[in-house]
Amino acid sequence: MKRFHIALAVADLEASIADYSARLGQPPQALVYGVYAMWRTDNLNFSIRQQPEKAGQLCQLGFEDDIAQGFTSSTDVNGIAWERFSTLEQDLQIIATFGVPVHPAVERDLIRN
């Protein structure tokens, strides 16, 4: 499966989780309290991280692609970071960067260490 990835910085993680959960029609699949949340829909991989000083700014774009080998990142001509990764690679990046997520939307999708 291939999903478009968007990552944003937000001022208030809890308020943003409530807002984006309503907009996406589901709770986040992965949550690291006070720091990070991520939703996976059929076509979208959407994540937010609490960075009040950068609220509303784009962190990166990219693709979650199950056939991706590893985790790659490049910068386009406008200075936007683009990433390509498999679901497993992103899960490992989340754990390494933010910690082990809790409260998945679906128990079978729990990211485990």
What are these regions (language model features)?
Residues 1-17, 59-61, 94-113:
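N-terminal beta-strand motif that seeds the catalytic metal site of vicinal oxygen chelate
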Residues 25-27, 48-50, 58, 65-68, ...:
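Short, low-complexity, polar/charged sequence segments that are solvent-exposed and flexible
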Residues 3-11, 37-42, 51-113:
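Vicinal oxygen chelate
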Residues 1-2, 7-46:
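Core segments of cupin and vicinal oxygen chelate
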Residues 46, 55, 88-91:
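Flexible, glycine-rich phosphate/dinucleotide-binding loops
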Residues 16-18, 49, 56, 71, ...:
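Short acidic, gly/pro-rich beta-turn/loop elements at beta-sheet edges
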